[in-house]
Amino acid sequence: MTNPHDIIIKPIITENSMDDMASKKYTFAVNKKANKIQVKQAVEAVFGVKVEKVNTMNMIGKVKRMGAKEGKRADWKKAIVTLRPDSKEIEFFEGM
């Protein structure tokens, strides 16, 4: 899992994550096995920014019904990345 693109799966675009962008906090879905150090290195490598801290949380998949059958969505990991004050913003999120 040394490739940064294997660690960062996708950005999370919600109202709460958009509000956090004002304080330079960005939310990503990351690989379930990745730790905070790997997430920090991946964000710095992919986006060319300086990361101050990383908060991670394991999200449990919801139980959903499909007709008479019951299934479960996959568990996943969420990371909230806080950038340093002197760092530039991530260009991917600009214009949203």
From Swiss-Prot:
List the source organism.
Alkaliphilus oremlandii (strain OhILAs)
Q: Which domain of life is it from?
A: Bacteria
| Protein's name in the database | Large ribosomal subunit protein uL23
The question of whether Endoplasmic reticulum is a record keyword is answered with: no
Q: Can you supply one Gene Ontology CC term for this chain's record?
A: ribonucleoprotein complex
Against Pfam families, the record matches this protein to: Ribosomal_L23
InterPro entries linked: Nucleotide-bd_a/b_plait_sf, Ribosomal_uL23-like, Ribosomal_uL23/eL15/eS24_sf
Family assignment from sequence similarity: Belongs to the universal ribosomal protein uL23 family.
Q: Which residues form a coiled coil?
A: none
Q: Write out the entry's keywords from A to Z.
A: Ribonucleoprotein, Ribosomal protein, RNA-binding, rRNA-binding
Lineage per the UniProt record: Bacteria, Bacillati, Bacillota, Clostridia, Peptostreptococcales
